[in-house]
């Protein structure tokens, strides 16, 4: 039974899959390769060549499947070559063969070899040996991870034998800091834009800081306010709703009730 379905695990399908995926498998010379006639290697190769010559599924060593004419001619040559070798072996015609160079038809410029895919057996692919991997380092790292799991802390990773300690230097990570404010630019329909500063972190109950522009870092940052700062100017009526006063300076004093998460601080 033959099938083109790659899910059917037959000897022919495995040979076709190995031909398409195993790039380290060498090609063979169909003129001189020693086929095993007892194990039906020739008949198996012949049937595969006959079946696959219309589907262009085989990967040929010196022919591209994109050129349909060259591919069909190459497959026909392989097919007829293997058929002639089987006929010579089956009818015992070895002694009747003639040397092609002895015939006067300008044979010296003809091809004396014909390479094709090896469809006889499945060659084992090269697998990396266990010596290629640093097993000692893997075992040490696994032991350190087990120590951390047992102790419940990362104290074992801070030793000099740890993977984070290399050549007398600690492999420390660079600290990451996040700003509490981000800049935003709004553009209206007429093309006018206005830059604003958006507060993204207002967890504290009362904001004892101001937002200032840092020239060295080229971004806004928070600056702590003195303890004697008077917030009464924000509540002239005694209620909790602050008045809407323009901010003429770059230093903006704000209260938690006047800025909520996602609100804007407009700066002229």
UniProtKB/Swiss-Prot annotation:
Any one cellular-component term (Gene Ontology): cytoplasm
GO BP: any one term: protein catabolic process in the vacuole
Family affiliation: To yeast YKR075c.
Other remarks in the entry: Present with 2010 molecules/cell in log phase SD medium.
PANTHER family: PROTEIN MTL1-RELATED
Stated name of the protein: Uncharacterized protein YOR062C
């Amino acid at each position: 039974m033959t099938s083109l379905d790659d899910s059917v695990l037959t000897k022919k399908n495995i040979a076709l899959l190995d031909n398409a995926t195993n790039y380290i498998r060498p090609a063979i010379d169909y003129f001189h390769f020693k086929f095993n006639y007892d194990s039906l290697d020739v008949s198996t190769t012949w049937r595969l060549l006959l079946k696959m010559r219309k589907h262009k599924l085989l990967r040929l060593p010196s022919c591209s499947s994109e050129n349909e004419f060259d591919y069909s001619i190459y497959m026909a040559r392989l097919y007829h070559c293997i058929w002639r070798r089987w006929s010579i072996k089956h009818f015992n015609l070895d002694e009747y063969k003639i040397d092609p160079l002895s015939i006067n038809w300008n044979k010296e410029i003809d091809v004396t070899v014909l390479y094709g895919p090896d469809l006889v057996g499945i060659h084992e692919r090269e697998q990396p040996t266990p010596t290629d991997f640093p097993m000692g380092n893997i075992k040490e790292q696994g032991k350190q991870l087990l120590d951390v799991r047992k102790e419940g802390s990362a104290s074992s990773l801070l030793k000099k034998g740890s993977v984070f300690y290399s050549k007398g230097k600690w492999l420390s990570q660079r600290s990451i800091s996040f700003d509490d404010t981000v800049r935003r630019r709004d553009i209206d329909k007429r093309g006018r834009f206005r830059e604003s500063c958006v507060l993204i972190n207002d967890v504290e109950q009362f904001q004892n800081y101001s937002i200032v522009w840092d020239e060295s870092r080229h971004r806004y940052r928070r600056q702590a306010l003195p303890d004697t700062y008077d917030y009464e100017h924000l509540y002239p009526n005694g209620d909790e709703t602050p008045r809407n006063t323009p901010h003429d300076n770059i230093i903006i004093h704000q209260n938690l009730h006047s800025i909520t998460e996602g609100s804007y601080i407009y700066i002229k």
